[in-house]
Amino acid sequence: MPDISRRRVLGLMGLAPAAGGLVSAGVSGATRSDKPDAKSDSAPSAPDLLAASRAAREKIRLKYLPNVTLYNQDKKRVLFYDDLVKNKVVTLNFFYAKCEGVCPAVTANMVKVQKLLGNRVGRDLFMYSFTLKPEEDGPAELKEYQEMHGIGPGWSLLTGKAADIELLRKSLGFTYPDPRIDKDKSQHIGNIRYGNEPLMLWSACPGMAHAQWIAESISWVIRS
């Protein structure tokens, strides 16, 4: 499968705070006053800004980052938000072990990204792939997939209850508007979502974009 053009990937990689509007609304509400002597041009205080940021982050967590129970390729039990995402920079995508469509190509491309990022993976960045077929992919199958594709440390493959995986997929936006296509797992979305959770910076890119461009975009999120 050919790499996606640089022009297209740059258009899809535009970064923005996932809840910028929430932060603005929170700050506005915290600093507005109807009293005649209130200074309309006064800047919001540091405590107000911090409170607004925390409120926005919590709204994002509740709506998009469900704290479901998962198991990685080493049979370790983890919670999605508390253990995998909170206070971290992450990449997120979906696959399944016996996929004959986009999965092998995306995995191979992300292995290139992992190598480009070097020892930052597992330290400054954590990579997560979630199976779309938890009824088939247990920890043993995920471990085999990891070894087969040369996936290195800092990249976890995860499974769990089917209902939890589906909740996670929908919450993270890996869906098609057409329900007939959306339920066909062989046509699943091959995108990568990446973000800086504490800073509320989230974006996405095609999984087959040029590995160097993906690595550069992720590095920008790490530095933010």
Regions found by a protein language model. Name each.
Residues 182-224:
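Thiol-/selenol-based redox modules, centered on thioredoxin-like
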Residues 69-89:
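A short beta-strand-turn-helix
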Residues 1-17:
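N-terminal secretory signal peptides and thylakoid transit peptides that target proteins
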Residues 31-67:
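N-proximal helix/coil linker or "cap" segments that precede and/or mark the start of modular domains
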Residues 144-189:
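Short, internal strand/loop/helix patches
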Residues 107-128:
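Conserved helix-turn-beta segment immediately C-terminal to the redox Cys motif
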Residues 82-102, 110:
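Short active-site neighborhood of thiol/selenol oxidoreductases, capturing the structured segment around
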Residues 124-136, 154-163:
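Thiol-based oxidoreductase modules, predominantly thioredoxin-like and allied folds used
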